[in-house]
Amino acid sequence: MKKLIYIFSPLVISCSSIKFVGNPTITHLTDYVKKEVLSEYEKKFWHLKDLAKDSIPGMSVDRAYKELIKGQKGEAVIVAVIDSGVDIEHPELKGAIWVNEDEIPNNLVDDDQNGYVDDIHGWNFLGDAELENMESVRLQKKEIPGSKAFEKFEKDRLKNIKNKKKELSDIEDIIEQYHESDSIIKATLGKENYTLDEVEIFSPKTFSLMEALIFKRFLNDNLLTKSKLEVYLQEAQNSINAHYNIDFNGRAVVGDDPYDINDHKYGNANVIGPKKKGANHGTHVCGIIASSRNNDNGNRGVFDNSKLMVLRAVPDGDEYDKDIALAIRYAVDNGAKVINTSFGKGYSPNKYWVWDALKYAEKRDVLIVNAAGNSGANIDPGYKKTYITDDVDGEEIVSNFVTVGAVGSSYNNEQVASFSNFGSINVDVFAPGSEIWSCVPQEKYEFYSGTSMAAPNASGVAAVIRSFFPKLKAHQIKKTLMDSGMPLYQEVENPESGELVSPKTLSKSGKMVNLYNALIYASSKSYKK
C-alpha cells in the first residue's frame, strides 16, 4: 500500500448554510503521477485537474465542483481585470461580463455620477492608444542627451533592439518553415485540410517529407500554431517600432497628462479597445477566470459566476502608473471584490500613486491578485525589482495583495515554470501558468504561458471563496490561498540557477493554489479580524 501524505487532517465543517465534506487532496504521490504524454483534452484542462484523482497536478477545480460544491450557488462576485482590453463579445464570456446597472448605455451622460460616462462594462483608460514605449525609454527621454543616465538607458535600449531583431528573424524563419512543411504535407496527402493523426501514420519516403513531419511534430509538441506564431511576430515588430523606439509617442492620442494624477477626465467606455486583436491578452485572462463551466469543446473557467469588470489600462508596451492607480480605484469604488493584475514592469516613476491605490483597496476589503513576472528572476528585496509590488523597502505595506508565480503540468523537479519569477518573500504562492488553454478574440482559442495565466487561475479560486464565504476579509482569503495550497514537488529547479531547491525558497508558502483544499480550509477556520 502506497503511503499518502495529507496536507492537513480530514475535515467535515459547515459555514452558514454551506457544508463542504471531504479529505484535502494529497501530495507527493509520485507513484501515481501520470507518466505518459497528456491527451489533447488533458492538455486543455490540466490546470483544473487533481493530483489524487487524475494524476495531474492542477488546482482540483473539477473535483471541487463535483464532490464539494455539487450545484450549490454562492454569490456572484465582481472580478476586475486590469489588462489590455477584452473581447466582451466572445461566446465564452457571454453572461460573465459585469454590467453597471446604474448607467444608461450610450446616452453620453454620467448617470451614476462616478466620473465616467457610459461605463457599462468598465472603463478604457487608454482611449484609442495601442502601442507604447517601455518605461525605461520614457525615462530616458527625460534625461539630457550625453549624460550618464541617458547613456545607460541608451545602452540598454540598443541591446534590447538587437535582441528583438534576432527574435524577429528567428520567428520569420519558423513561419517560413511552417509554410514549406505545410505545402509538402498537403501535396503528399492530396488535401488542403489534415489532422495531426493523419500526419503521424506516415512513413516518409523522401528526406523533405521526413523534415516536414519532424517540424510539424516540433510545432505540435510546443503548441505553436500559425496564429500564435503571427502574434509573436507582431510582438517582436512592435518592440522594435514602438517599445524601444525613442521617437515614438503612443500617449499623444489619449490627450491627458500621464504625470498628473488629478487629470482623470480621459479615456472612453470602449473596453474592447480600438482593435479586437489588441485584446488578446485580456481576453485570454478573462477566459481563464470565468468561461462557462458547461463546456468541453471550447474552454472552462474556474468560476463562471464571476462578473468581469473590464479595465483597459495596459497597452502594448509598459503601462503608466497613473492608469493603474486610477483603474484600481475605479474597481474598488464600483464593487469589485477581486482585482486581477497580470502585468508588470521594471521601473515605476510614480509608484506612490499605485501604493496609495493598494492601500485604498485594502481599506475597502478588496483582494488584488498579481502576476509575479516572467524573467525567471528572484524578486525578493535586494534582487530584481518589479512593479506593481506591495514591497516597500523590504516591508509589506498591505495585507490584501497576493503575488503569484507559475507552474506547469509536470509533477517533478521541473514543476516550476522556467520563466517564472520567484522569491521566498515577495512571491506568495504558485498557480498553473504554463500552456493554459483559453479564449482569444474573434471566437478563437489558444494556449499561452506566463504568470499572466497563473494570476487569473488564482483569481478564479479567490472568487469562488469570496462567493461561498462572503464574510471572509481579503487578507483572510489570501491566507486561505497560501495555507491550503498543495505543496510543490519536494525539490524543484530554481528558474534562475537550475539548481534543485526546496519550494519554500521560491515562494513564501512553497505551495500552489488548490480550490478543493481552499473550500475545506475556509470552512475550518475561526479567523482573527
List where the protein language model places each region.
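Extracellular S/T/G-rich loop segment that most often corresponds to the catalytic His/Ser-adjacent loop
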Residues: R251, V366, T389-S467, K471, ...
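Mature extracellular/periplasmic domains of secretome proteins
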Residues: Y65-K73, K276-A279, R300-F303, D318-N340, ...
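C-terminal subdomain of the subtilisin-like protease fold in secreted/lumenal serine endopeptidases
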Residues: S17, N23, V332-N334, V338-T341, ...
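Bacterial Sec signal peptide processing site at the extreme N-terminus
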Residues: C15-D31
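Bacterial N-terminal signal peptides
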Residues: Y6-S14
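Subtilisin-like serine protease catalytic core
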Residues: K66-I78, V86-Y320, E396-N400, F422-N426, ...
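Active-site glycine-centered loops adjacent to acidic/histidine catalytic or metal-binding residues
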Residues: D83, G373, G450
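Short acidic, glycine-rich surface-loop motifs adjacent to enzyme active sites
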Residues: K35-K44, E154-E176, I328-K351, A371
